[in-house]
Amino acid sequence: LKNGKYKNFDLTLDLRTTPGGKGAVWFHTDPNLKKGYRIAINNDRADKVWWKMTGSLVSVRNLTKSFVKEDQWFKMDIRVAGQEIDVNINGEPVVEYIQPTAPYRTDANTYALLSEGTFGIESDGSGEIQIKNITVNVIDESTIDINAQLAEANDEQNDEIIKLHQSDFPVLDYHVHLKGGLTKEVAAKQSRKTGINYTIAPNCGIGFPITNDQQVMDYLNEMRSQPFILGMQAEGREWITTFSPETLKEFDYV
């Protein structure tokens, strides 16, 4: 960790935030944190900046939902190989980004680019960020097919989504249903590719796929391993009495 010239690597660490704790893990940076990328650490669901939650590749792939809670230990894996940056939280992929030949960056993010450098931990909240079990494994650059990566990269000069992320604007589709072959895995991969966050909203009510409290909880428990905002699309007039108030509160919104 001391040589400050890490380029291709796997970084793994266990983290926990106390209430109000937030910050970032930096890589390809310098001692002053003036260059490179940062991965957000923020599990405060009441934070006014709700579109930069844990796992976000800040201003490039901002995430609107953390499925990790405050006071809960979690594992973060950051892999940088060639032009690709991957972030996993508790083993689940949340970011898959390939930096193109001509990345789009605003003036404020001019130096948010791949290069090489040291790691840094930034804490800028009112609580603590606790860290343990830090490991780094260097990746042999000769094993990386950079040309193949670049062939898969987005054209950011003509990509309106990256421009919104760079402008610190939340990018979120509030109305997505899992139907017609769109599974949670397909939706999550599509979200990671495009940079658009999703709200997944099941149809709930009499005559619809989810009709009672137990089905709601089964659905939510299945979905909580993905960084989706979980809404409920209430159907019919009976939904108010079909589902208990306690169950309705389990959704992010109705």
Question: Predicted regions: what is each one?
Answer:
Residues 168-253:
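A metal-dependent hydrolase metal-coordination microenvironment
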Residues 1-157:
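Carbohydrate-interacting regions of secretory-pathway proteins
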Residues 153-170:
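N-terminal low-complexity, Pro/Thr/Ser-rich intrinsically disordered segments
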Residues 103-104, 158-161, 191-193:
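Short hydrophobic/aromatic-rich motifs at helix boundaries and adjacent loops
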Residues 78, 161-165, 240:
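Generic hydrophobic alpha-helical membrane-segment signal
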Residues 4, 68, 126, 164-166, ...:
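Structural motif
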